[in-house]
């Protein structure tokens, strides 16, 4: 576990360290691939979302570790274990249950949701997914800039890598 990026801010009496990126490293017993995988979560999530699925199945991190990849789980700055500071990063947002259910519930608003069977309403897996959501910065542009700066530092440290993203973390 380590942190990359970030900066000191504030005045001489009250300095803060902010905008750093929390990173966990998982190395398989036998590495089979030259490039590690950096996994970067989407909005409202943390690196924990790569470790296990809401219904208890193996997460992507364990899958790739089992296949011989070194895996870096990174948390976007100002989110989760990459501390957020209100005086530096401003207000945060949080997904509402209604906004998340639009992806999973058959409410008639999205035609494709009628075919959805993975998250039947009230299912424990959906509750686990909803419970895993955290606050995030309201501006994707601000989030992207912070990830760009800290991600650059991570790549300087580890070298070339495969970047695996989810949702808001994508290109």
Predicted feature descriptions by range:
Residues 125-162:
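Conserved acidic catalytic loop of the alpha/beta-hydrolase fold
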Residues 57-84:
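Conserved alpha/beta-hydrolase
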Residues 1-32:
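N-terminal cap/lid segment of alpha/beta-hydrolase-fold proteins
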Residues 44-52, 71:
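Serine-hydrolase catalytic-loop signature spanning alpha/beta hydrolases and amidase-signature enzymes
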Residues 33-42:
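Short beta-strand element of the alpha/beta-hydrolase
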Residues 164-170:
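Gly/Ala-rich beta-loop-alpha elbow adjacent to hydrolase catalytic centers
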Residues 89-128:
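Low-complexity, serine/threonine/proline-enriched polar segments
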